[in-house]
Amino acid sequence: MKIYVDGREVIINDNERNLLEALKNVGIEIPNLCYLSEASIYGACRMCLVEINGQITTSCTLKPYEGMKVKTNTPEIYEMRRNILELILATHNRDCTTCDRNGSCKLQKYAEDFGIRKIRFEALKKEHVRDESAPVVRDTSKCILCGDCVRVCEEIQGVGVIEFAKRGFESVVTTAFDTPLIETECVLCGQCVAYCPTGALSIRNDIDKLIEALESDKIVIGMIAPAVRAAIQEEFGIDEDVAMAEKLVSFLKTIGFDKVFDVSFGADLVAYEEAHEFYERLKKGERLPQFTSCCPAWVKHAEHTYPQYLQNLSSVKSPQQALGTVIKKIYARKLGVPEEKIFLVSFMPCTAKKFEAEREEHEGIVDIVLTTRELAQLIKMSRIDINRVEPQPFDRPYGVSSQAGLGFGKAGGVFSCVLSVLNEEIGIEKVDVKSPEDGIRVAEVTLKDGTSFKGAVIYGLGKVKKFLEERKDVEIIEVMACNYGCVGGGGQPYPNDSRIREHRAKVLRDTMGIKSLLTPVENLFLMKLYEEDLKDEHTRHEILHTTYRPRRRYPEKDVEILPVPNGEKRTVKVCLGTSCYTKGSYEILKKLVDYVKENDMEGKIEVLGTFCVENCGASPNVIVDDKIIGGATFEKVLEELSKNG
């Protein structure tokens, strides 16, 4: 298609989504603060104004047509853009030097580009909130109401934990009832952070904890994820460096790390264990489909939204936690030191990994998680030129990995790695990969023992619900919360859009190409670990496997009925939500209260009313201590109370 831009002829694709993208694809960048190619068109910021036949309109909402005449930089458009920026800045927190986005903020960049040195409009003040309850930090004083986070959370991730509230000047993006983020169903994927154009959303910085550890007498060990090495060079103006991981090892040793291991070894370990777990389930026809569990954002989403599928999640830990447990439980013993002596630092592309490390199931394993951006900050703080660092290999025994293990950093990597193990152990007769539909890839696999199954790769949590409703014939499903997998994690450098993520996936593939080992089975260090330290099933289960639990999507609000203030007690919570109430929970509550009173147990059994335990399909629900009883009856509650006292 031929259009005319500022008086010159330009050829664009016929199927462009809008004029904004069409111009971007031919090298003409129109300013914008609210446009996301992956989400719906919003048109709120008005920065992307262009003139068409004398009429000024937003380029993000305009479809190009043959012969269109476009003006992108008239004096009138320039003045309108400046006015918009000044109005935004008038109520914006302009403490740029202490902002997490200093140097990468789009608003800051445009203010510089348009030469804004003073604000002509009076600054009006409104109440702001800074929520630091979770690894994702919210600061409404820096929010420009672009709606990017709202659309990403709702449309791409299907979570919808944040939304616009109030009206006019008082408008704000917040959670339901202004609930702290950590108490909501937020999966902490960080995609809102990745797409936020300002510092309104950021990631909790844990560098100070590392500095403190480096100054102590602890053994400081680092481990680096695959996707980190594919992106960190962006912070230093390097297009691609397949030796970046080894340079990072050298840098970390320089600042005081004692050992640096490769999380790709943990990926080999997880894939090997998960392949055997899947094959056993497949042969028995139990707990299928098996979902991968490497992505902590997906795991948290499943706990909130799909409690019925928790038994289907692979019980194998993520590479971070599996390798971390091996280091703390096995490597520490071989060093002859208590595990508390080791301070373990995980370098990840992911914000949810911070939450994963803090889960009670993993307490004391990974001490801190630093994102790719935090690692870049660490390098900049040190004043060391990463380009001139002499590469060093990862430390043995957990520094050797396969191509397949390194592939965990991109979408499809986990499934491919599991297949590589099955091919080595059993043999694959045929793999038939179907054409992707809505970004979801499905493959039909036939093993040499005659067993066949289907596998799927899904990235973006918003695609999961529809897929599960429509497809019941898939036996193994890889789910990654972030588009393009871990290379698109919320902790990766800015910008973090689809084009950049595609490039990172390419860098990772190029890096995989220099690996001599193809599959985890070829990793002799992994096989030695199994032979020496993971010989029996009990040890493997203790070191490599974990558990999951249903989580509420809303804060727990209980009603005291028979409270017991202090002392040793059993607690019974009867759900009084609509579904449970209509199916008899109130009758259970009445019987329970009468039972406690008649048997003089008011100081021993606490009775509470609660609302929505996220298990409506099994109503009525009663929680005895921490155990949810679905399809509850008064008799079942008494039976549970009779256990352990």
Curated annotation (Swiss-Prot):
Residue sites binding [2Fe-2S] cluster 1 per the record: C34, C45, C48, C60
Broadest EC class assigned to this enzyme: oxidoreductase
Quaternary data: Heterotrimer composed of HydA (alpha subunit), HydB (beta subunit) and HydC (gamma subunit). Near neutral and acidic pH conditions favor oligomerization of the heterotrimeric holoenzyme.
Binding-site list for Fe(2+): C486
Disulfide bonds: none
Domain (4Fe-4S ferredoxin-type): residue spans on this chain: 133-164, 178-206
Recorded GO MF terms: 2 iron, 2 sulfur cluster binding; 4 iron, 4 sulfur cluster binding; metal ion binding; NADH dehydrogenase (ubiquinone) activity
Compartments, record wording: Cytoplasm
Chief place of localization: cytoplasm
Annotated source species: Thermotoga maritima (strain ATCC 43589 / DSM 3109 / JCM 10099 / NBRC 100826 / MSB8)
GO biological process: ATP synthesis coupled electron transport
Pfam families, A to Z: 2Fe-2S_thioredx, Fe_hyd_lg_C, Fe_hyd_SSU, Fer2_4, Fer4_7, NADH-G_4Fe-4S_3
Amino acids binding [4Fe-4S] cluster 2: C143, C146, C149, C196
GO cellular component, one term: membrane
Domain 4Fe-4S His(Cys)3-ligated-type as annotated: residue spans: 76-115
Protein name stated in the entry: Bifurcating [FeFe] hydrogenase alpha subunit
Keywords tagged on the record: 2Fe-2S, 4Fe-4S, Cytoplasm, Iron, Iron-sulfur, Metal-binding, NAD, Oxidoreductase, Repeat
PANTHER family membership: NITRATE, FORMATE, IRON DEHYDROGENASE
